[in-house]
Amino acid sequence: MTFITLTIGLSLRTIFLIFIFLPPPHLLARTTSLTRRQTRKTTIKVFVFILPFYQTPNW
């Protein structure tokens, strides 16, 4: 049982690292798919909060 939880934790950690190192469009698509269930106002808030982080490398 502990081995199964250990492998699940490792796979989740690798998936998290993969999502960190993915290009910004994939991350934006993932955030929009997560916030699509909520209202449009919260989606706009998420985009306003996330977009400056993707603009900073271009400076």
Curated annotation (Swiss-Prot):
Entry's Gene Ontology cellular component terms? extracellular region
Query: Keywords of this protein's UniProt record, alphabetized?
Result: Secreted, Signal
Where, per UniProt, does this protein localize?
Secreted
What range does the record give for the signal peptide?
Answer: 1-29
Query: Could you name the domain of life of the organism this protein comes from?
Result: Eukaryota
Q: In which tissues is it expressed?
A: Expressed by the venom gland.
Family designation: Belongs to the non-disulfide-bridged peptide (NDBP) superfamily.
Name it: Venom protein 27.7
Traced from the root, the source organism's taxonomic lineage reads: Eukaryota, Metazoa, Ecdysozoa, Arthropoda, Chelicerata
